[in-house]
Amino acid sequence: MNRFSFPLLAALLLLIAVPAWAQTDVLGQARAAMSNGDYSRAATLLSGLIGAQPSADAYVYLGISYAHMREWQRAEDTLKEGATRYPEDPRFHNELAGVYLAANDLDRARQSLKQALTVDPANRYAGDLLATVDMSMGNVEGALEAWNRDGRPVIGDVLHNGHVEFENWTIAKASTFRTGEILTWGKWKTTEVRLRETAIYANTGLEIEPTPAPDRYTAVIRAPLKTNSTEQLILPALEALFFRSPTLRLWNLRNSAVSLRLNYRFATNRHRAEVGILAPLPLPGLLFLEATGTYRSERWDISRPAIDTGVDHRFRFQSTGVRAKVKHIPNYRLELGAGFEYRNRTASGSQPGIALDSRNTGKLLFDASVLVYDRRLRSRIQGETLIARKNLLGDMDYSSGTIEWNNRYTLDDEGKHSIEVTAKAGTSRGALPIDDYFVLGVRERGNNLLRGHNTVSPEGHYGNSPMATSFTLVNATYDRQIRRLPFFNVLNFPYVDLKWLVFADGARTFDRAHVFEEGKILVDVGGGFKLETPTRTFNLTYGRSLRDGAGTLAAYVGRRW
């Protein structure tokens, strides 16, 4: 057997080691040049090395050198080539994110950081930078999801508008996170929903700031309190113009979190006065108490939706009532409510079947809402029911309930295009009084939208749209944002989104009492404009009924969800 001689073996090892030594030496020279700020020399050395003996380190350092030389395109091309040749190395995606951030391209930076986390889920640098980028874009959910990958952010201090002392006691009671706990999206969202339900804050937001302590962060709740300045009188003036129903709102009386609402509708044939109080109760998680007292004096004319039996379809309705209701929000996905309402009624007319008499009603009220899905698609199921009984201070026995399924899908990342579809159904038992019939159509604060039918006649009478003891209803709306108008909390909201919309509504009604027409499929189509704040909407639409060809131009307000 032939054996290698020792000199031959040494020569062979030397030949193998020379290229590696040479590569290491060139990399060392390039790193030294980079340390001295001589990125041009480093780029020259690394370019030659890649041509002769490419490596992941050479590509990474060359991309960094080009970035420091502000040659962004060459840096991007180099790092992308390196990522293609060495797909298991997350450094290329980390550095690409830095290149995109330098160009203020936040979307592509986020994409690169997500790719880095796909390659290495334990990449703390990419996770932290992704969370920081998301926070700067206002994407709190994305930021918290990125941090939560490795058990962050652990909360050190909780501030309100940058202050250690909370400006109102509801902050502490609504909050679901404490010092030393990991903040998750669910905890913040529950806190945010509770704060908005108090109705005393113009807006709510969250900022996460690092602290000198490792892995500790400060949570800053941004929630400016609403004011009762004279500028707020603009809204009642607009309500008087559009609805003849101005509402004076006094927020957070003496910083107690109690708010007062005074409303008077002076519309001909539809007078109404209401006093309402909203008071969060100082319990863990908050319990919301809303109490209202209402007076109504109205003239109705139901000749359009009623079956023509030859009787006079006009009548007068009056009532004085009180309502108290409590709501609890254990989680942002779940809301529960219960209450009681008493009405002292007086009604007079010749129309049979709708309790035109002086019998009073006492009712138990229950409602629940479940947010089933909360991503680009938001899906919610909610139900309401009332139970009227003679042993509840009333003179009538009946019940009714509704269930609805709300869906909204955002078509783009910016949230400027969306489609909303709602399916709703209601039913009842017992002889319903006219004031608890289901009414479909458009009114100031309508719950059952059929936007080609106005609930009010040109003469100002209620009873102009379909009414029923049970119904099914579908609403479909597409809207697109035209512009976001900043208001800087001048009118107690930070901004208003101006949108245009088109819609199609379909419904079918039924009436056990055989007072109103039933069974026909109703279809309304139309369009209009919408103003949206973070919590409310104002809509101005024109809808046309395909069943009878009638059209209506109407304004109404709603609540965002």
Predicted regions and their residues:
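Alpha-helical segment of the N-proximal tetratricopeptide repeat
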Residues: 24-55, 61-64, 68
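Alpha-solenoid helical repeat scaffolds
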Residues: 27-28, 57-61, 91-95, 125-129
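Register position in tetratricopeptide repeats
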Residues: 35-36, 68-69, 102-103, 136
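Periplasmic polypeptide-binding modules associated with outer-membrane biogenesis and secretion
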Residues: 86, 91, 98, 102-241, ...
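Gram-negative/organellar outer-membrane beta-barrel architecture
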Residues: 197-382, 443-468, 537-539, 544-561
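C-terminal outer-membrane beta-barrel translocator/porin domains of Gram-negative envelope proteins
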Residues: 230, 363-500, 510, 555
